[in-house]
Amino acid sequence: MRNAPTVYPGLMVPAMILVISTIIAGCSKNDDPDESEPQTKSVASCEGCHTNYAHLQEVYTPDTAAPAGGCGGEAPHYEPYDRVRMDGDGYEAFKQSSHYEIGCTGCHNGTDNTADKELAHSGDFISHPSVMAAEKCASCHQEIVDNFVTSLHNGTGQKRKVAIRSGFDGPEDFDQLPPHQIEGYNANCATCHAGCGECHVVRPPIGGGGLIDRHNFKKTPDMLNVCVTCHTSRGGHAYLGVAAGTQPDVHLTALDYTCLDCHDAGEMHGDGQPVEQRYAYSKLPECENCHTDLKSKNNYHSIHVEDFNCQVCHSQDYNNCGSCHIHGDGARIPSYLDFKIAGNPIPDVVPDFDLTLVRRTLAAPDNWEVYGVEYTNFDALPTYNYTTPHNILKWTERTDVGNGKACSDNCHIRNEGGALINKELYLFQEDLLEWEQSASSGITVDGKLPESWFEEK
């Protein structure tokens, strides 16, 4: 324990006089602004307005539409004045940053030093500067901006599929789509595809938008308020163990990992090289980065580690939904838990696996009906994607067999009196809806499993 300070009585009176003198001086007029109490900035300035909560409530403009919709559903609501408010610890941290030194109009354009709200936000004002990253961010972050053009967070993967199903070659042709279809994509599908700001400064639109920490720039995005806000129904839903009967991912419960422990900044920002889809990306994390010598770990691995992806054994049931009616009815196949093993949909990208987990996508022939657009080549891609659910456990319904049972008891199909046990784990042609069959029949397991599995014992 630290020793108490020694008190010297002879010094008490002078000290008291000094304190009293200081108090008196503090009550007198002080012409030195550096020594005075902090002053409220004038509302006739960007910073003064956005740090004056009462004034924001007086001058705000009510919303005329929700900030986002799309497949994520209705976004949570934050009042307009709460979305742009700057105060508290976040604002104080922002003031200590190099971004603060740039000044409000340095990033947002517009006009400073005016109480006229319309004038302040007039002309070339931009609410989200990172949509013009080449102009606003590149002077300090040139490499990141250059690489981000091909980042999956910039939407290249989804744009690729829309373009291919529309009869084009890939994401580079996206701008050739009808303008109203592009408008619909931006208003719906793109609400989760992010620029710099949506990870580092503001909530993604699907999370309600607005400053996430009073304009503080977060170098490391917050997992719940940023990552899971977009990756809700498929990523966060699984990783946090939200669904009934599921458990959180072991990487969360045992290691307290956040998304950035596996998916680092290099992966998020991109490397400038275009890829067909996310599993072709060079910086994608692999289980083997941490789990070495997998083949020799146990009998399960020695038999199957080269046959299918790790999630076939170690994933729990995961969320699916499908048939999105964009800007209309939304997902007409509502979310449901499922587990499907199918033929590898991307053998050119992940050539090592014959069987993989797959997840139903939102694709449907009439995705763009509201916008008067029909796909011309819908069958070019399957309606189920290769998937790696983030709900890993060592012991799952597939791996945790009963005492005395064969290790394959919960995963191989077997015929017991005409009943095919475990058949529901696999994607068969009969599982496809009529409009899915032509696009997805190539990845079903029909004719690809051992005949002995179907013979009655």
Each language-model region and where it sits:
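Sec-dependent bacterial lipoprotein signal peptides
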Residues: 2-25
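C-type cytochrome heme-c attachment and multiheme electron-transfer modules
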Residues: 22, 27-206, 216-457
